[in-house]
Amino acid sequence: IFFLFVSSIIFSNTTGELKLCAIRVSFPLEDDESTTGNGQFLKIANGINCLKYTIDPPPHNRSYFESQIKAVSSYFDSVSYGAFKVDLENSDIFPFGEDNSYELDSSMASYNPYGQSSQSEGKITRLFQDAIVLAHSEDGIDFSEYDLIVVFHAGIGQDFSLPFLDPTPQDIPSTYIDRDMIKENIEGGSLVINGYEILHGIILPETQNHLLYEISNDMFSSASSPCDYQYGLTGTFALMIGFAIGLPPLWNIETGKSGVGIFGLMDQGSNNGRGIIPAPPTAWSRVYAGWEEPVDITFNTNIELPSRYKNNIAKVKINDSEYFLIENRDNSIIENISIDSLQYIMWKESGEDSITPFINILFDSS
C-alpha cells in the first residue's frame, strides 16, 4: 500500500521519449532511530543476507541508478508497444561522479515529521525544492533541457504497510510533486531556476528493500521467511512516472480504497512481482495514453484476443456513456504453464502448509 500525496495531474505527452534529470541527494551523517540508514547512500549491505537473491543490491552509485532508469524505460517500452520510453541517451544523472551526491543541510526526518500530517506536503515539497536549488548551485544544471526531474534520496521510502509497527515512521514517502503542491507550498507560488519554471517532479528513495539495512534484523526477527519482504524500486518508479505523464490513479486517493487492485500499474499492480515486475497499465489506461486502440464488438460475436498483442482490446458498449474493455491476461512462464499452476504443484509436492513463495517459482522455472 502506498502513502502518496497526490492532487492534480499535469497532462504530459504519453508518447515519444522522456528526458529525465535525476538528482542524487543525501543527508548529514546521522544515527536517527526514526529513519532507515544513516543519511548516506548504501555502499554495502549490512542487514539480512538473502543468499539466493538480493533485490537492488548496493553499491547504490551512479551505475545503479542508470540501471534503475534503464529498467523503468524497458517497462514502459514494453507495455506501450514502443510508443513511450525514457530517452536514455539524453537523460542525465547528477552529480556525474560515480559515488557522489548532493548533501542537504537538513536531516531526513525533518522532511517527514512524525505526527504532523498537516505539514507533510509542505515538507516534502521543500525537499524537492532544496534538492533542485542545491544541484543547480553546485553544477549549474540547465533544467530546461529535461522533461522531468527525479530526486533520488538516500534511504527507504515510507511507502508500504508492514505487518508490524513501523520502527522508522519518518522515512520519506515516494511522491509525485504536482503543480498544486508547488503553488501552495513554495514562496511566491512557483519554482523558478535561472529563469525556467519547474512545474512538477518525482521524489524516490534509493531502494525499497529494508533487508539491506541493519534495522531489518530486528524488524523481521519474527518472520519465517524475511527475504520474501524484499521489494524492488521499479514498480514505484513506474507508478510515479505514470502520474507525471498524466495517467490517472485508479484508486480512491481520498480514502485509499483500491479500484483495479493488482491488475493495473496505477493501483496496487505497481508492487507485482515484488516490485520488479509491475503490472502493465490497464486496458483503459493504455487506450487513454494513446498506446492502443480498442476494437468495437457487438453481442453474439465470436472474437479472439491473443495475450499481450497490440490493439487486442475488445470494447463492448453498455449504453451511450458506458462500456466494458476486455483483454486477455496470461501469466504463463512457458507455453501452457502458468505461475499459479507451478505454485500449486510445488505446494502439493512439498507437503508443507504454506504456499511456495512467488520468487522461488521464478528461480525454479528459469
Regions found by a protein language model. Give the residues of each.
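Sec-dependent signal peptide recognition
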Residues: 1-4
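N-terminal signal peptide c-region/cleavage motif recognized by signal peptidases
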Residues: 7-9
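N-terminal module-boundary/linker segments of secreted carbohydrate-active enzymes
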Residues: 13-59, 63, 129
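Short helix-terminating capping/connector loops at secondary-structure junctions
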Residues: 15-16, 141-146, 257-260
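Structured segments of extracytoplasmic/periplasmic soluble domains
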Residues: 28, 44-50, 54, 75-78, ...
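Active-site-proximal segments of metallohydrolase catalytic domains
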Residues: 63-211
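Extracellular hydrolytic enzyme modules, especially secreted metalloproteases
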Residues: 148, 154-343
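Catalytic core of carbohydrate-active enzymes
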Residues: 334-366
